Amino acid sequence: YVSNRKQTQSSDMVLADCGAEYQNYTADITRTFPINGKYTPEQRIIYNIVLEAQDSGIVASRAGNAFKDPHKRAMEVVQKRLMELEIIKKPEEAKWYFNHGTSHYLGLDVHDAGTGTALKPNSVITVEPGVYIPEGSPCNKKWWNIGVRIEDDILITEGDPINLSVRVPRKAEDIERLMESKTMP
């Protein structure tokens, strides 16, 4: 929903893509949370698919891997899971619902330049898969109007990637617990 002309309903979710700038360097993260503090069963399923896709993309965020490797890994998860749910019939149909890249570099611009090279130590990328199922999609109506994106900032190292935004809750149950407590940890 992008028109921004209607009041949110209790069963809606909000996708918040937020950023900051510090000493001319930028960063952004995204979370998707339920207005009423609890994901519906269908929202939770899609949320967990996106989280699994993000985890897979983060694992692929290693020095020497291609910039597109996190996207390939995330897309594989989305394809498999949406087929299992019969939301899509063929893997290539996942592009209907996951229709953007998974990563961008962070630096002097929030969407810093670069896509074609191998990932290098000390660079920072985002890993931000998303699944967005609009009303009227050729799937069961229970999936309509669910959109989820989860974005974190990942430091490429000589070893394992480091999630720089790890303190911001990512799991559905952690977000629900945070919303119930109404305080930040």
Residue spans of the language-model regions?
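Active-site neighborhoods and metal-handling regions in enzymes and metal-associated proteins
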Residues: Y1-P185
